[in-house]
Amino acid sequence: MSPPVSVTKMQVENYAFAPTVNPAGSTNTLFLAGAGHRGLEIEGKFVKFTAIGVYLEESAIPFLAEKWKGKTPQELTDSVEFFRDVVTGPFEKFTRVTMILPLTGKQYSEKVAENCVAHWKGIGTYTDDEGRAIEKFLDVFRSETFPPGASIMFTQSPLGLLTISFAKDDSVTGTANAVIENKQLSEAVLESIIGKHGVSPAAKCSVAERVAELLKKSYAEEASVFGKPETEKSTIPVIGV
């Protein structure tokens, strides 16, 4: 067996993102694929609203390696297809959105819902099922408020389940506040952050940089194991340091 790949924690503003997590809605350990802020230019000043961490199940590494090993961080950053593979790949994802500035659940959920519906209608995939899923999504957030340091967390199952959790501190464990079964909505949350029109270019670049390095390491280790064929998938576990 190849030696484990280690991933490090990251700091975004005053908020730390652990190298690995065991989130609500999952029995697996997911590793930190990248982190960054979300902000907007307001009256000539860039204002940061949230710090975002993106975690992936370790099976993401061999899956992504099939197409993306050997690519540079810049090549991955510039590739819409790479981020689509991250969003839609057959492995779990976990996204933690931590408030830098206060935000109400209504403000957050309405913006996410608006972007999702516009995208689905634009590509012709909006149905009654998506409409019902959006209503459930809005209901979950309706009475919530998120002060600085509070987090919204999403666990995305490849089966199409979206587990939503809230925390007032840096905890990522505990019980789920809601589970919504809709594959398009499940994928849309992460897509809205690191996809083609993602709201966090910083998180997007971070994911590209860290995944490129993990693919590089896994490929080098795979090739060095007693003539192991290049096409054989790696089963390298990911641990935190």
UniProtKB/Swiss-Prot annotation:
GO molecular function (one): chalcone isomerase activity
Organ and tissue specificity: Flowers.
Database matches in Pfam families: Chalcone
EC number: 5.5.1.6
Keyword Isomerase: yes
Induction section of the entry: By UV light.
Positions that bind substrate: 50, 115, 192
Electron transport among keywords: no
Family affiliation: Belongs to the chalcone isomerase family.
PANTHER family referenced in this protein's UniProt entry, alphabetically: CHALCONE--FLAVANONE ISOMERASE 1-RELATED (PTHR28039:SF8), CHALCONE--FLAVONONE ISOMERASE 1-RELATED (PTHR28039)
Note: Part of the biosynthetic pathway for all classes of flavonoids, a large class of secondary plant metabolites, many of which are brightly colored.
Protein name: Chalcone--flavanone isomerase A
Organism listed in the record: Petunia hybrida
